[in-house]
Amino acid sequence: MLDIQLIRHNLAQTKQKLALRSKGLETLLDHIFELDFKKRSLQSEIEKYRALRNKQSKEIGLKKIKGENVEGQFSELKKMGSRIEEMEKELIQFENQINTLLLSLPNIPHDSVPTGGPEANKVVKTWGEPRQANFPLKTHWELGRELGILDLERGAKLSGSGFSLFTGNGAKLQRALIQFMLTIHTEEHGYKELWPPYLVTEDCMRGTGHLPKFALDMYATDKDNLYLIPTGEVPLTNFHRDEILAESSLPLRYVAYTPCFRREAGSAGKDTRGLLRLHQFDKVELVQITKPENSYTALEEMVSHAENILRSLNLCYRVVLLASQDMGFGAAKCYDLEVWSPGIQSWLEVSSVSNMENFQSRRMNLRYKSSSGKNILCHTLNGSGTALPRLVAAILENYQKEDGRVLIPEKIRTYFKEEYL
């Protein structure tokens, strides 16, 4: 959530910066500005009435001591109290309106972010070479079916389209990759592992910016008003919601494996074949909570942590700096990591690493106490380290052999215990 001070004191500049993300926000910003002006005017009026009431209350007290008649003044005092109550209710309405509108605004892009849509995305790094083969390469769904490790038909029978079902060595590969990634992130990168709930409250979803903006993309339980998490970012970032952290404890680094659940309401026209776009998928998520001055160093660090996973698996990948209109709702700056999948001849996003600055912490009331005793909003960052379905797809397509077998990447054989699928 944006700071109301930006709109109150720098409206023109805020309009200019948010226009880089989306057109049509000027009217909304003007409306927030007007509501805030009315709210502050009402606050001033309430304060004047309170001061007058206090003054008259003291006068009545002195007159009563002297035995003077205060019936008329007491009646006026009661009317004034009723008027203050009415104005306070009106003030709450203004505050609720403003907060609701602020929740609908995206984050302001960092100055280093390219301007524009997906066409303005910038490839900042490429590692490895796309695989070349002297035989026709199969797609991951063909390999999965032929090896008997991926049953999309039965997944659909159980839950409908958009759900996968791994069997035998396919399930074993998933488990090996999860264990491998968690080991790397905890032992080499210094993250603390959490095993969080997969159902969270509305406050948690609002805290990370998934509500109210993406309500239609979420799976919700109506009776309990709980939401299935769309990403491990939600429980990990909300872990310290409504807390004041010690400055010495920062940065905090958390990692967790979780399944993720997304309705993908806006996926029409996108490639949904095989493992490319699912309603339920597995992911290892990274979150850091930092001081503001350290968050952009942490962002580059988190990108390198996700890269380490891909390099360890010897997968060709590229790092893409997303443009202002292609970033996630709450991101100030975001990198995507994409692996080359030769069977489908496409780059697949397996990680998205974002600096949210204080966009989430303002929503979550997440602060730290500085050495001067001041409570300061933390910066939060999140990233996939990495997502499983497309990583599995890339491994199957990159490591396939002409005889139909798939070589297991060397780094995960310790967990898989076999050389081939």
Swiss-Prot record:
<dbReference type="InterPro" id="IPR002314">
    <property type="entry name" value="aa-tRNA-synt_IIb"/>
</dbReference>
<dbReference type="GO" id="GO:0004828">
    <property type="term" value="F:serine-tRNA ligase activity"/>
</dbReference>
<keyword id="KW-0436">Ligase</keyword>
<feature type="binding site">
    <location>
        <begin position="231"/>
        <end position="233"/>
    </location>
    <ligand>
        <name>L-serine</name>
    </ligand>
</feature>
<keyword id="KW-0648">Protein biosynthesis</keyword>
<dbReference type="Pfam" id="PF00587">
    <property type="entry name" value="tRNA-synt_2b"/>
</dbReference>
<keyword id="KW-0030">Aminoacyl-tRNA synthetase</keyword>
<dbReference type="InterPro" id="IPR010978">
    <property type="entry name" value="tRNA-bd_arm"/>
</dbReference>
<feature type="binding site">
    <location>
        <begin position="349"/>
        <end position="352"/>
    </location>
    <ligand>
        <name>ATP</name>
    </ligand>
</feature>
<dbReference type="GO" id="GO:0016260">
    <property type="term" value="P:selenocysteine biosynthetic process"/>
</dbReference>
<comment type="pathway">
    <text>Aminoacyl-tRNA biosynthesis; selenocysteinyl-tRNA(Sec) biosynthesis; L-seryl-tRNA(Sec) from L-serine and tRNA(Sec): step 1/1.</text>
</comment>
<comment type="function">
    <text>Catalyzes the attachment of serine to tRNA(Ser). Is also able to aminoacylate tRNA(Sec) with serine, to form the misacylated tRNA L-seryl-tRNA(Sec), which will be further converted into selenocysteinyl-tRNA(Sec).</text>
</comment>
<dbReference type="InterPro" id="IPR006195">
    <property type="entry name" value="aa-tRNA-synth_II"/>
</dbReference>
<dbReference type="InterPro" id="IPR015866">
    <property type="entry name" value="Ser-tRNA-synth_1_N"/>
</dbReference>
<feature type="binding site">
    <location>
        <position position="384"/>
    </location>
    <ligand>
        <name>L-serine</name>
    </ligand>
</feature>
<feature type="binding site">
    <location>
        <position position="285"/>
    </location>
    <ligand>
        <name>L-serine</name>
    </ligand>
</feature>
<dbReference type="InterPro" id="IPR042103">
    <property type="entry name" value="SerRS_1_N_sf"/>
</dbReference>
<keyword id="KW-0963">Cytoplasm</keyword>
<dbReference type="Pfam" id="PF02403">
    <property type="entry name" value="Seryl_tRNA_N"/>
</dbReference>
<comment type="similarity">
    <text>Belongs to the class-II aminoacyl-tRNA synthetase family. Type-1 seryl-tRNA synthetase subfamily.</text>
</comment>
<comment type="subunit">
    <text>Homodimer. The tRNA molecule binds across the dimer.</text>
</comment>
<protein>
    <recommendedName>
        <fullName>Serine--tRNA ligase</fullName>
        <ecNumber>6.1.1.11</ecNumber>
    </recommendedName>
</protein>
<keyword id="KW-0067">ATP-binding</keyword>
<dbReference type="GO" id="GO:0005524">
    <property type="term" value="F:ATP binding"/>
</dbReference>
<dbReference type="InterPro" id="IPR033729">
    <property type="entry name" value="SerRS_core"/>
</dbReference>
<feature type="binding site">
    <location>
        <begin position="262"/>
        <end position="264"/>
    </location>
    <ligand>
        <name>ATP</name>
    </ligand>
</feature>
<dbReference type="GO" id="GO:0006434">
    <property type="term" value="P:seryl-tRNA aminoacylation"/>
</dbReference>
<keyword id="KW-0547">Nucleotide-binding</keyword>
<dbReference type="GO" id="GO:0005737">
    <property type="term" value="C:cytoplasm"/>
</dbReference>
<dbReference type="InterPro" id="IPR002317">
    <property type="entry name" value="Ser-tRNA-ligase_type_1"/>
</dbReference>
<dbReference type="InterPro" id="IPR045864">
    <property type="entry name" value="aa-tRNA-synth_II/BPL/LPL"/>
</dbReference>
